[in-house]
């Protein structure tokens, strides 16, 4: 019996999302043949959607919970609850322009275009983020005040400032300069694609990763809230497994205080007596990077690590 509707992303986040859910204990089948795959939990129905659409769909309640990039949550100004950073799908939204342009920042680009009385053309998939970024620029505010840049899409045109034009891109944004655009606002992982197209990054608008997000009304429904938090709990386990390690060791009674002094103070180890007289088993979960630092010290007082 369905309790919640779960939206999973198609595209760049797709494979990593299925792997993540597999690590969380879920099995999803049929995703290559249908947009409504089967999950091994009859209380969850899954639908595959574009990550750009998921935040708004969750806000409007057609889906209860889902995964999308934080960039699309902000771009859509979606009124949703961000439950958990899933720590994958890490990207940056950047401002880039041709290597031939000597400008080192957006203010310089804008200032040059103003001096030369030339329209600044921006291509991007992120219309709202681009508009906000441009209008927050000090050079822009000084010259144009609160005038909104001209925004052009196939469906509508808005804005009053024709000196700065923001054009919607359907993709392959890095191919637009210099003929169709002077500047692009684009998403990158490593920046290699920009480099191959003779473009350089001059600013980072935001960093983004995959997030588990939920509908506010769904979280007020007792049954849905409980199921959403079940999903959240399993997702937390996967995220924490990346950054933490569960350690087990055998310790002589007279060395226990030494070991407890080495283990990070915020952790609460489990200590149980072993059948061998005078020996104890100690286990705890600690941050992975801290484990690497304390391992040499632990080996002086413990065995079986």
Model-derived segments and spans:
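Small-molecule-sensing regulatory modules
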Residues: 1-43, 48, 67-81, 85-90, ...
């Amino acid at each position: 019996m369905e309790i919640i509707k779960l939206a999973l992303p198609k595209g760049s986040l797709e494979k990593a999302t299925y792997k993540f859910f597999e690590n969380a204990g879920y099995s999803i089948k049929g995703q290559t043949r249908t947009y409504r795959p089967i999950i091994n939990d009859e209380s969850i129905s899954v639908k595959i959607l574009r990550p750009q659409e998921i935040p708004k769909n969750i806000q409007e309640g057609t889906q209860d919970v889902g995964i999308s990039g934080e960039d699309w949550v902000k771009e859509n100004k979606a009124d949703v609850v961000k439950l958990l950073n899933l720590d994958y799908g890490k990207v940056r939204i950047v401002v880039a322009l041709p290597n031939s342009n000597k400008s080192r920042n957006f203010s310089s680009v804008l200032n040059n275009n103003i001096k030369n009385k030339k329209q600044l053309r921006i291509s991007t998939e992120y219309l709202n983020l681009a508009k906000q970024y441009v209008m927050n620029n000090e050079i822009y505010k000084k010259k144009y005040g609160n005038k909104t840049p001209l925004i052009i899409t196939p469906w509508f045109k808005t804005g009053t400032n024709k000196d700065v034009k923001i054009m919607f891109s359907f993709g392959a944004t890095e191919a637009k300069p210099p003929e169709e655009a002077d500047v692009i606002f684009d998403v990158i992982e490593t920046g290699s694609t920009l480099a191959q197209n003779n473009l350089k990054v001059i600013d980072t608008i935001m960093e983004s990763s995959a997030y588990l997000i939920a509908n506010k009304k769904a979280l007020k429904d007792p049954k849905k809230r409980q199921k959403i938090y079940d999903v959240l709990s399993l997702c937390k386990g996967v995220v924490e497994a990346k950054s933490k390690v569960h350690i087990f060791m055998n310790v002589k009674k007279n060395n226990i205080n030494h070991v407890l002094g080495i283990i990070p103070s915020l952790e609460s180890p489990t200590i149980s007596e072993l059948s061998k007289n005078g020996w104890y088993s100690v286990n705890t979960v600690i941050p992975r990077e801290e484990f690497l630092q304390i391992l040499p010290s632990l080996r002086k007082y413990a065995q079986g690590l």
